[in-house]
Amino acid sequence: MGKVVGIDLGTTNSCVSIMEGGEPKVIENSEGVRTTPSMVAFTNQGERLVGQAAKRQAVTNPTNTLYAIKRLIGRRFSDPLTAKDQGLVPYKIVKADNGDAWVEADGKKMSPSECSAMILQKMKQTAEDYLGESVSEAVITVPAYFNDAQRQATKDAGRIAGLEVLRIINEPTAAALAYGLDKKDGQTIAVFDLGGGTFDISILEIGDGVFEVKSTNGDTFLGGEDFDMAIIDYLADQFKKENSIDLRKDSMALQRLKEAAEKAKIELSSSNQTDINLPFITADASGPKHLNLSLTRAKLESLVDELVQRTLAPCRTALKDAGMTAADIDEVILVGGMTRMPKVQAVVGQFFGKEPHKGVNPDEVVAIGAAIQGGVLKGEVQDVLLLDVTPLSLGIETLGGVFTKLIEKNTTVPTRKSQVFSTAADNQSAVTIRVAQGEREMFSDNKTLGQFDLVGIAPAPRGMPQIEVTFDIDANGMVHVSAKDKGTGKEQSIHIEASGGLTSEEIDRMVHEAESHAEEDAKKRALIEARNNADSLVYSSEKSLKEHSDKLDDALKNQITAAIEDLKAVMPKEDPEAISSKTQALMELSMKMGEQIYKENPEAAGMDPEAAAHAAGMHGGAATGGGDGANKHGKGAEDVVEAEFEEVNDDKK
């Protein structure tokens, strides 16, 4: 049985680890270093360089040296953050035929997955050189807030690199595994993971081999690269003041600034001042120009204060979602190279009211956790149970543009949820299932992941077909959706992939807007549900009136006809209370109609008085989730809610 490697595929650096003798071990690369720069370069000679070799030549070959590729993985070219990234890097970001963001180097267009695969191949080779045998299986880590497209793209990168990816594991969860493997007593911990390109915060309860994630949040476009850019902008602005030359327009000068910024940032974690000297950075008609200035820790902290403060909003949300306060956290674990910055440590300590735990190596702990997870999957590590969560709610569009959630955010994965819907029109032979992620009440306010059609539905009156929609999120956090017509057995499924990733800004916007627009959303939904109820009742009442006209007295027929017209008149209005009131009035008359039909010919009706009343039009709860009087289709049928496909109320099964 071959070894399973644990790989931390980072934005700035990557790391590989294995289980050896029951203990995780980080493997040094061919340069003798335990972390490898996540960089790929293509030389004029057609040679491909990965890791430290690529980093060494970046200044002289900036347009063909690719770094921070992880920020593009699973993203669309039209994504606003792709445009932001274009202003930060010297290499070309181009639009692929499918609309994804790709990169171009040495005249060749490549997907971010392909570039990431080159880094994974380097990590694979590092492990093989140490073990003296081939490696084919891996556990790869991703930010907890990565969406489905980004996770799928990461898994694709593993496959391109020749690895069978046994599991995609969230970085904070991997760090918690490494920290808590030997912890027997129960603890509640917060994993604060600020890396090179992404930020995650996860709240976990750990103890006696059980690692349960209570909530997770984050920002997939916040990390060390942004801190570097803040320094680069400062250096470029200072130089421009003195020399009237913008160094950001020179790709080679920009690469030198990046190296200097990264070096200064690291030095200022242990000293109060550093000197930045870049001779011959550029030239003009008067001759060569040199950049020479001092940067203090205080100045650096003022430059990046806004970035550090941005980490706190996800922390507050994660605590709120977990139903906890900062006082409930026993330990705060710092993960990612940026947590070495004193300013970050101070802000985290102040927020949680306790000194952060610094007993783990922030650059290696994620890879170690990935190796432990590999050991768990292979049976080398016993008595460990890992319970992770999905970061966003998942659902589908139903009648009126409502977003019907099937799986709520922070639900433990793997998970599977099914719900039965129905058609919205008579003889409807196909339905379109549209899938989204988000927290808003209306589908259009959330992020569409994809859609598919279920065709071949047998012709039937609306509300009769039973269409079971199933959401399945696997242990990798990847989404599968299927729909099945329970009558015909027809089934259609979609594996959501590379449909344009959700950005951290979009996620934050969804959550914040969901909170600020909660009242507005509730009113909008109430109006749609009231109209759906009314429409369903009008339809069934008119049908019953037509079919059983000879069994009803004229007075009741006139009353029902008038009530139907009254209800139709108020339905277009933006007044859910008025619609509900008229719906209730028609429902009461429908009950009387059912009673008359039953009294007139109980055997022909073939049902009890309550069922007769239903047949006569008692469909008042049809679109609300199956309240009292929800439509029943035959004996033993499930209560369904009329939506774009009617929703079954599971509680009444």
UniProtKB/Swiss-Prot annotation:
The modification Phosphothreonine is found at T198. Induction: By stress conditions e.g. heat shock. Residues 608-617 have a biased composition (Low complexity). GO terms for molecular function: ATP binding; ATP-dependent protein folding chaperone; unfolded protein binding. SUPFAM superfamilies: Actin-like ATPase domain (SSF53067), Heat shock protein 70kD (HSP70), C-terminal subdomain (SSF100934), Heat shock protein 70kD (HSP70), peptide-binding domain (SSF100920). Residues 608-653 are annotated as: Disordered. Residues 618-629 have a biased composition (Gly residues). Gene3D superfamilies: 1.20.1270.10, 3.30.420.40, Actin, Chain A, domain 4 (3.90.640.10), Substrate Binding Domain Of DNAk, Chain A, domain 1 (2.60.34.10). Keywords: ATP-binding, Chaperone, Nucleotide-binding, Phosphoprotein, Stress response. Residues 639-653 have a biased composition (Acidic residues). Acts as a chaperone. PANTHER family: HEAT SHOCK PROTEIN 70KDA (PTHR19375). Belongs to the heat shock protein 70 family. NCBIfam families: PRK00290.1, PRK05183.1, prok_dnaK. This is Chaperone protein DnaK. It comes from Magnetococcus marinus (strain ATCC BAA-1437 / JCM 17883 / MC-1). The gene is dnaK.
